[in-house]
Amino acid sequence: YFFTTCPNICPSMNNNMKKVYEEFKDEPNFLIVSHTCDPKRDSAAVLKHYADSMGVNTNKWVFLTGRKDSLYNMARVSYGIDDPKNIVANIDDDFLHSQFFALVDKKGNVRGAVYDGLKKKEIEKLTPYLIKIK
């Protein structure tokens, strides 16, 4: 989860993920999915421009937007990258900004642990799982 205008952790996270992308982008079973945490500003067109600026193939790295409540619920419940207790009463007051990545298999199951996208050692922990798709 990131947002295109983030001046803090998002650029570092996405640069780390781009290294993973570069290593595995030619694998047929490899796909990165990044969700915006700011759907009010990050429209599909804005995300497409962002992907283009990163120089990635959007068939291999997908940038998604949607309804804020659905995006945040997915982060907390499906991916486990934010504590469900962080939910606030009004979704408009909620802001999920996390440096964590989840490795999800093609069946939608989170594999392994949740990884800190700011730490090189954490990113390296993804490699054994990704090598299995080769």
Language model: regions and residue ranges:
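Short active-site neighborhood of thiol/selenol oxidoreductases, capturing the structured segment around
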Residues: 1-17, 33
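Short, flexible turn/loop "capping" segments at secondary-structure junctions
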Residues: 26-29, 55, 103-106
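Extracytoplasmic/secreted proteins, especially bacterial periplasmic and envelope-associated proteins
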Residues: 12, 19, 42, 46-49, ...
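Thiol-/selenol-based redox modules, centered on thioredoxin-like
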Residues: 87-134
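Extracytoplasmic/periplasmic, Sec-exported soluble proteins
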Residues: 5, 9-12, 39, 63-66, ...
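Thiol-based oxidoreductase modules, predominantly thioredoxin-like and allied folds used
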Residues: 28-42, 59-69
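Short, internal strand/loop/helix patches
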Residues: 48-98
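Short hydrophobic signal-anchor/transmembrane segments that target glycosyltransferases
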Residues: 16-26
